[in-house]
Amino acid sequence: MVGAKAFDFNDPRRTALSLLNNLLGGPGMNARLNIVLREHRGLVYTVESSLTAYSDTGVWCTYLGCDTKDIKRCLYLVRRELDRLCNQPLTETRLKAAKRQLKGQIGIACDNHENYALDTARYYLLKNHPYDIQAQYQAIDALTPQDLQQVAQQVFDKNRIFTLIYK
C-alpha cells in the first residue's frame, strides 16, 4: 500500500485529486497503474487507488497485490507514475478523456439511489446543502493540466508518501 495525507471534504483541490486518483487506479481498465503493473508486466493480481475525504483531513492510497519477489519493482513503477504526474502536465486530449470518464462514472453512481442518498446526506452534513451533480461536473470541467500537476506535486511528494507492506 502506498499513500499520503490528502485534502479534507471542503478543500476545492479535492476535485483535481479525484481526477488524478481515477487516472491512476480508478475502476476503469485504462487506469495507469493497471496498464503499467498488470497489463504490460503481469506483476500484480490487483491494483486500485482510493481517495477518502473527511471533515478535517483526507487520505489517498494505492493498494496492490503482488508476489513478494516483485514488491520493489512494483513500488518503483508506482513511484515512476506518480513522478510523471508531478513532472509532466497531461495533454489536453488526455485530460478531456479523463474528465469525460470521471463524469460518466459519477453519473452512473447517481443512478444507484442508495449511493445518491448517502452522498446527499454527506453533503448536508459537511457542506449544509444537497449534492449537486451539475456543480460537480462544472468543477471537473474547470480543471486544467496545471491544476492537476500542482495537486500531484503537493500530494505525491516523495517526502509525504508512506508505504505499508503486508507479508
Locations of regions flagged by a protein language model:
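M16 family metallopeptidases and their MPP-like homologs
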Residues: 1-7, 34, 38-87, 92-142, ...
